[in-house]
Amino acid sequence: MAAITASMVAELRAKTDAPMMECKKALTEADGDLAKAEELLRVKLGNKASKAASRVTAEGVVASFVGGNAGALVELNCETDFVAKNDDFLAFSKTVAELVATQNPADVAALSALPLDGSTVDAVRLALIGKIGENVSIRRFVRFETANKIATYLHGARIGVIVEYTGAEEQVGKDVAMHIAAMKPVALSAADVPAELIDTERRVAEQKAAESGKPAEIVAKMVDGSVQKYLKEVSLLNQTFVKNDKQTIEQMLKAADAAVQKFALFVVGEGIEKRQDDFAAEVAAQVAAAKQQ
């Protein structure tokens, strides 16, 4: 059997970007034949990508891009916070955000089919899965195209905001975007709050008010008061400005002769159920897998 040297491992790693131990295993299996080892490794990485692509992705980043009269916000997911900080993953997320803004894909499927690096976005995504060993998915995106101004704000790459606004001061757009990230409104105004959210809040308020034992007319007023308070708390224009608790967002905008047309807020992993593994079960699974090898 041919001796596997460190330089051989380094050369194979440079060609494939595979982990060092994987390169050494492939070279050993190929009896030192670099070309054969590369082929074996590509097969293994393909299998690895296939397996990883079925796993839950609840971590990740939000990326943004603004250019010309268009802006985009994109959420990409991975499995661990460690990979969410990986340079290749971050670079891919920024590229995807730029593609959304400049190419205007209709949906994630159309985005995935766009050309990238001599291939497609999806092919690059699958190659990234093989390289880092975790599932990577493009979850969602939003794109604004307007003659108005666009502001974005990222908080630790886990919360992202994009705002369309009018007004002379760019700081206003930045302030509103930062406020949205902090206070997480669900709608621009009270009239825009989805009916299902209001219905849910009303049911909760009715149950609480009914427990008070007060007369029906008092209960009705209590419910209405609770709903109105909720609408004030979740609608952007009615919220108290985080940088000045003496003003609402609406008052701040009016003072600056500005207005917000729309916004979008992404929070990484929002609504995705994380897989919670039992440690003992995980060890048992690894032992069982080792016995089968």
Curated annotation (Swiss-Prot):
Protein species of origin: Burkholderia vietnamiensis (strain G4 / LMG 22486)
Record's GO cellular component terms: cytoplasm
Region annotation (Involved in Mg(2+) ion dislocation from EF-Tu) ranges: 80-83
NCBIfam families: tsf
Entry-linked Gene3D superfamilies: 1.10.286.20, DNA helicase RuvA subunit, C-terminal domain, Elongation factor Ts, dimerisation domain
Role according to the record: Associates with the EF-Tu.GDP complex and induces the exchange of GDP to GTP. It remains bound to the aminoacyl-tRNA.EF-Tu.GTP complex up to the GTP hydrolysis stage on the ribosome.
Protein name: Elongation factor Ts
Entry keywords, A to Z: Cytoplasm, Elongation factor, Protein biosynthesis
Molecular function terms, GO-annotated: translation elongation factor activity
PANTHER family linked to this entry: ELONGATION FACTOR TS, ELONGATION FACTOR TS, MITOCHONDRIAL
Principal subcellular localisation of the protein: cytoplasm
Family as reported in the entry's similarity comment: Belongs to the EF-Ts family.
Compartments where located: Cytoplasm
